[in-house]
C-alpha cells in the first residue's frame, strides 16, 4: 500500500529520472571505470565497501542518495573485484536481479489495474440494486419509473467511466513510471558489461548512453563536455 501511494505522488514527475540524472549516472560510471582501469579494482575497495562515505560517489549526489542503485552497482563491483570478471556471468546475474526489480516496481500498477478491472462490476451491482428498487415501485406512473431506471443506470455509467476513464489510465501511467525506474538499472548494467568486455571507460559509458530512450538520452557532445570537466579519479 505504501509503495502504491508513493507512486501516486511520483506520477507528477512524469518519469523516475531526468536527462540530468542520466548525465550524472554516466559520469559516475566513467569515474569508476577510469579508476579501475588506471589503478585496478583494489583501488575501488573503499568506495565499494563504504559507498555512503565515498568521496567518489559524493561527487554525484543524485546517485549517492539513491540507496538501491548504489547498492546494486557496488554489489557487482565487489563481485568483479573478487576476481569474477566474466561478462557473461555478471550479465546473467544482473538480468536476474533487474527482473526482480521490475516485478517489484510493477506491483503498484498491477494493484491499481486490478481495482480498475473490478469497478465496472460495482457499477453493475449498483444498477441491479436500482432496478430491484424500481421493481418495488412498478405501480408508479411511467415518468416516475423512468427517473428510477435512469438513476439505476447511472451506476453502470459511473463504474465504466471510473474504470476506463480514470483509474485505468492511472494504472497505465504507473506501469510506464515503473519502466523508467528499471531503465536506470539497465543503463548501469550496459555500462558495466561493456567495460568488462574490454571497452575503454568513455566507450563503455557511450554504450550506456545509446541504450537510453531519446527523451532522457544526452547527446554525445553534452556527455563529452561533462566528462571532460570531471577531475581525475583518486583512490
Can you describe what each PLM-predicted range is?
Residues 1-108, 180-235:
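Large intracellular
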Residues 93, 97-176:
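Helix-termination/interfacial motifs at the ends of transmembrane alpha-helices
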Amino acid at each position: 500500500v505504501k509503495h502504491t501511494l508513493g507512486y501516486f505522488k511520483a506520477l507528477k514527475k512524469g518519469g523516475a529520472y531526468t536527462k540530468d540524472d542520466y548525465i550524472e549516472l554516466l559520469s559516475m560510471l566513467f569515474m569508476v571505470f577510469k579508476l579501475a582501469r588506471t589503478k585496478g579494482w583494489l583501488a575501488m575497495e573503499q568506495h565499494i565497501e563504504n559507498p555512503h562515505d565515498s568521496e567518489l560517489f559524493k561527487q554525484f549526489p543524485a546517485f549517492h542518495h539513491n540507496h538501491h542503485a548504489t547498492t546494486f552497482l557496488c554489489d557487482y563491483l565487489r563481485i568483479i573485484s573478487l576476481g569474477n570478471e566474466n561478462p557473461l556471468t555478471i550479465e546473467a546475474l544482473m538480468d536476474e536481479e533487474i527482473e526482480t526489480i521490475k516485478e517489484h516496481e510493477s506491483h503498484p500498477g498491477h494493484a491499481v489495474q486490478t481495482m480498475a478491472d473490478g469497478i465496472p462490476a460495482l457499477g453493475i451491482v449498483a444498477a441491479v440494486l436500482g432496478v430491484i428498487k424500481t421493481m418495488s415501485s412498478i405501480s408508479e406512473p411511467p415518468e416516475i419509473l423512468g427517473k428510477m431506471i435512469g438513476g439505476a443506470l447511472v451506476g453502470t455509467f459511473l463504474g465504466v467511466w471510473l474504470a476506463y476513464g480514470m483509474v485505468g489510465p492511472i494504472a497505465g501511467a504507473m506501469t510506464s513510471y515503473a519502466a523508467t525506474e528499471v531503465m536506470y538499472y539497465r543503463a548501469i548494467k550496459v555500462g558495466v558489461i561493456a567495460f568488462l568486455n574490454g571497452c575503454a571507460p568513455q566507450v563503455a559509458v557511450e554504450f550506456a548512453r545509446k541504450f537510453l530512450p531519446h527523451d532522457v538520452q544526452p547527446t554525445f557532445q553534452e556527455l563529452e563536455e561533462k566528462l571532460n570537466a570531471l577531475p581525475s579519479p583518486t583512490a
